[in-house]
């Protein structure tokens, strides 16, 4: 009987971590994210397990284990971050997993009121701020905002190396950020299409004209295409 009484606080902490983690995960599951209900519940429960075990073995330093949990969640969060073209997806899901671990730590320490308050705030951030972010995205784009662009030039296969270096020099001169440079065979046999991924301010007309006019001076380039990256 005494052993059961000793186990009750342990089980209560784990159940609280699981339920609050599941509450956060339910919102992610509803939005069909990779880390949903079960993942967040397990992350919170696992964090609580580590905290409880550290309090059993070394009750004076649970903070040391909490720091290790934060590091461990970094590896788990990296698994849900995906790069699609120039866009990165999964950052919010990874951040939510990190928060779920924090909820688990609070539950493991028996701070249920703080854990519940944090859960409510996390849910508000994921639900209410999502709506706010969508409204902000509908506002006119600031001239200082960054946009992604795709620059494609076509050249003879033998001139590819020289044209690549030419492009690098022009991009550096235009003070625009180059995030990717590659090439593929062009539709016309014997030619290469060089693709540059650029990042610059939304007010890009002057930069575009500078780059295109400079590229046009190169006789080795047979075609130029510039567009905003829609991904």
UniProtKB/Swiss-Prot annotation:
Localization of this protein: Cell inner membrane
Bilayer topology annotation: Multi-pass membrane protein
Membrane-crossing segments per the record: 5-25, 39-59, 62-82, 103-123
InterPro entries for this protein: MgtC-like_C, MgtC/SapB/SrpB/YhiD_fam, MgtC_SapB_SrpB_YhiD_N
Top-level taxon in the UniProt lineage: Bacteria
Role summary: Virulence factor required for growth in low Mg(2+) medium and for intramacrophage survival. May be involved in regulating membrane potential by activating Na(+)/K(+)-ATPase.
GO CC term, one of those recorded: plasma membrane
Protein name per Swiss-Prot or TrEMBL: Protein MgtC
Family: Belongs to the MgtC/SapB family.
Keywords carried by this UniProt record: Cell inner membrane, Cell membrane, Membrane, Transmembrane, Transmembrane helix, Virulence
Any Pfam family: MgtC
């Amino acid at each position: 009987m005494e052993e059961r009484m000793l186990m009750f606080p342990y089980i209560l902490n784990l159940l609280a971590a699981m339920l609050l983690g599941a509450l956060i995960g339910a919102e992610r599951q509803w939005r069909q994210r990779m880390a949903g209900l079960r993942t967040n519940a397990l992350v919170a429960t696992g964090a609580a397990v580590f905290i409880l075990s550290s309090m059993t073995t070394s009750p004076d330093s649970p903070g040391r284990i909490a720091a290790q949990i934060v590091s461990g969640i970094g590896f788990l969060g990296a698994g849900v971050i995906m790069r699609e073209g120039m866009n990165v997806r999964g950052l919010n899901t990874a951040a939510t997993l990190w928060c779920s671990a924090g909820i688990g730590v609070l539950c493991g320490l028996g701070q249920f009121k703080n854990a519940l308050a944090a859960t409510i705030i996390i849910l508000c951030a994921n639900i209410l701020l999502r709506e706010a972010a969508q409204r902000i995205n509908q506002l006119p784009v600031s001239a200082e905002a960054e946009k992604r662009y795709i620059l494609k030039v076509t050249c003879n296969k033998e001139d590819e190396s020289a044209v690549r270096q030419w492009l690098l020099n022009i991009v550096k001169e235009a003070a625009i950020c180059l995030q990717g440079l590659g090439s593929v065979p062009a539709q016309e046999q014997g030619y290469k299409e060089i693709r540059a991924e650029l990042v610059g301010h939304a007010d890009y007309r002057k930069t575009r004209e500078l780059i295109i006019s400079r590229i046009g001076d190169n006789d080795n380039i047979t075609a130029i295409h510039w567009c905003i990256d829609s991904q």
